[in-house]
Amino acid sequence: MDLRYHEIIAVNVAPFLYLLAAGAYAAPVEFNRDIRPILSDRCFICHGPDAGTRKIKLRLDSEAAMLADLGGHKAVTPGDAEASELVKRITADKPALRMPPPYSGLKLNAREIELLRQWVREGAKWQKHWSLIPPARPDLPAVQNKQWPLNPIDRFVLARLEREGMQPSKEADRATLIRRVSLDLTGIPPTPAEVDAFINDPASDAYEKVVDRFLTSHRYGERMAARWLDAARYADTNGYQSDGERMMWRWRDWVIQAFNKNKPFDEFTVEQLAGDLLPGSTTNQKIATAFNRNHRGNGEGGIVPEEYMVEYAADRMETMSTVWLGSTIGCARCHNHKYDPFTQKDYYQLFAYFNNIADRGRYFKYGNTPPFMPAPTPEEQAKLDAMDRKLSDAEKRYQDLDARIESSLRDWVNALPNAKPADWAVSRGLVAAIPQQTFDGSKYYDAGKLRAFGYLDSFSISAWINPAAPTGAIVTKGKDVAEEAGIGLVMQNGKLQLNLVLRWLDDSLRVETRDAIPLNKWQHVVATYDSSRLASGIRIYVDGREMPLKILVDELNQDFRTAEPWRIGGGFGKDFLFRGSMDEVRIYGRKLNAEEAGMLGIRDSLNQLASRPARSKAEQSKLRFAFLEEHADAEIRQAWKERNDLREQRERLIASFPTVMVMEEMPKVRDTFLLVRGAYDKPGERVTPNVPAVLPRVADGMPNNRLALARWMVDPANPLTSRVIVNRFWQTYFGTGLVKTVEDFGSQGEWPSHPDLLDWLAVQFSTSGWDVKAIQKMIVMSATYRQTSRAAPDLQQKDPENRLLARGPRMRLPAETVRDQALAISGLLVERTGGPSVKPYQPAGLWKELTGGADYERDKGPALYRRSLYTFWKRTSPPPAMMNFDAAGRETCIVRENRTNTPLQALNLMNDVTYLEASRKMAERMMLEGGATPADRLAYGFKLATSRNPRGKETEVLLDSFRHQLDLYQTDRGAAAKLLSQGDSPSDSKLNASELAAYATVASLILNLDETITKQ
């Protein structure tokens, strides 16, 4: 806890609730502010938008329905409360007549009844829901205290305070202020030097300079990205039972850079929702679309893929609705929304925008599931650019030799008919070549344990075959049992099959040629696999012609690599022993292209080909390749080899790049149906993409696809997006949004504490180029933000949640910042922007409890000390320390920040190796940087954590604690050694161990202070 004494006050939230309601405003009653919340909470469940649950056909969510003649009476008769059935029912004495009915458990208190009665008396004026009315910039309100406001925000806040007979608090001291804004904008506390520089800067713009420096820091993007990752449900695993690892961190890098570069929020929106559909879309714009691939993906066997295709599209749509619209339209999946004007048809029309993605219902258990793309880092892209320049030079050198090549090739071919016999075959990537074999159906040829291939390897199998029976194995690698793990190129009923199997049918690929091949005839077959883990990545050629394929099984999720030997003519069980002959069986460690497959299918020698007056394209290619590789002069051979080597190096480089799952439209639009009760297998009415009917229409003149939806999101006519986003920005700095229910701007959501301020900020944001940094700078530059957070008892009693903003924000730090601050204070923090996720300290054995028993292998070295933003996030076992401090679980979209206080948090700070190690490294800083005396060193450590010097009694407490701990560790040097061994970082052996341990214990005390883990 804070070393300063705070009296614990039991507070009642009722006074503030009263302030928010009609009693805080002069008459007349306002429908949106005062009446709609009552009707929504107590009446809409039976008399709202959902016809399925509506009683006696009475609607109270519609003005027309509310005023309609119900057979000689009306629910509401404007101006006449006594004639209104609504008022009669809510005041009825008889339980059988009273509304809400007693059995519902819903009640109206006396004040709410009087509000409804007063509203009817005043004419029952109806309003469209406030959030559905486009925001207009309100005039700045007049205020009495004209000296206090520093920008327009303050005018709105002060006007409300003055109406309540309240005054704002004084400005926080500079040490508090710089710590507050540093934690808010960067997630890292200021250094003592930064604090002192700010305190001693007499310039009138000293604070603004601090704000500008933090806004331009690379730390800013990391701080802002943390909350966006919560909203986007980012994780490093797929979720569900298997919860295998995926690779999405390049999207996280994109988010960080977008914030750091101050990408306008409209572009930020469009690129994430539809960057792939932008004309000439760039790699980065496609990476941005990973926002909508961050949802969970089920790789379990036995699932119904169609069911999960629906779940994924629903997740995308509902996440989009929460993040940009502050909408609970997800409640309309099975029926019309019970509170808001969203129909089930609205739901599925929005759903349709996300139902045309070329993904699959069953995700790969490990790795990324298509569609995905290479996503090189800037450093990797620089390597690729350099490689492309080298390749371009090599291509030019080769092309410059073209005339000489053609002349030399012609001379060589003309001489071949009279030359000694010569032949050539594709050799690049060749693993093995097996000569001619004859099989009688009783045995196979064991080729031994040649190179093994797995599902992330490309490979090819080539062979001349002369089959005598329609079924038989050509080349296999696996146990001599049908459908066991491994590779199998076989014939079955005359058709060629390639099988890649870990476990049949659960983890396997099987493709088959549509047509059978003839028996008792020599023919050449090639089967290739491209490492995609998809059946579409397989090709089969017969005599150089690509064969039409039928996909029989496309469910490969795990690696089929096996140590079993390669077998020629068998290996799939006795029923697949080959009968006939084979020759020139070749195995390649890469995917052969169509041209290479064609050349391998030419059995004639080079001499024979050269003797022909006319040659096929494949025959001409075989002559040309043979010449360039083996018979041209040295300069030509070198140019040819250099070009091919660089092409191969480029392929390997691209294959080494990280990938990211992205959005990609299907070429043919998938039909979308309204699903009865939300069930995937109960399609109803066919629907087309559209936005909810209650909202403005999508602009005409462009395809009605995700790009149209994305642009509609940031269209000035959209009443929600700008409000929703600035409200979440406000939550970042004040802990609570102007609308507390940041995820719900509907009827069940909260009325804004400052509606005019919300609208002013929304309009300012959208009309100033959607400038994220500018709107956030305005917030932190305001006098409202800069107030002290200390609250007198009367203010605490009147406004316990600080919704009226008569004081500055004070709240526990976010989970990431608690840890990052400890790393920064201790000097352990490794600041590297972007990159793969890391695995810092975590209690042993947590992952083993999960299905599959995978163990958590923590990192070593610098990776242990990266910012928490980069911590590996396993959905079924999130980082436990982060969860203790209320981090979002990342299973679904979370936009409201949660804060609790539990004993587990204190236990975490006192015992987790992260904080023990930080304490001892902080102690080293205290001894090496803090001065010569214990008092100076302890004051330095205190300032590292709190940005201020300890006060009199605080210094005494720190010194007493240090002396006590020093006595203990001088007596028990083993305990000192044990403490100083916590964590991987080395301890400074030059420092006295007992003294260092004593300082480390006090450092732990400081890191546990309420003031340390609180922004105030």
Predicted regions and their residues:
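Primarily short, surface-exposed interaction patches in extracytoplasmic proteins
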Residues: Q144-R180, D184-R219, R233-P279, P341, ...
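Solvent-exposed helix-loop boundary motif
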Residues: Y25-A159, R163, A175-R180, P190-D196, ...
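Extracellular glycan-associated modules
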Residues: I113, K396, D400-S656, A822
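Extracellular/periplasmic catalytic domains that process cell-envelope and extracellular macromolecules
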Residues: G52-T53, T77-E82, A92, G123-W126, ...
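Short, amphipathic C-terminal "tail helix"
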Residues: D984-Q1016
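Post-cleavage N-terminal segment of exported redox proteins
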Residues: D2-L3, E7-E30, R117-A142, A226, ...
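Active-site histidine-acidic residue metal-binding/catalytic motifs
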Residues: Y240, K261, T289-A433, F572-G573, ...
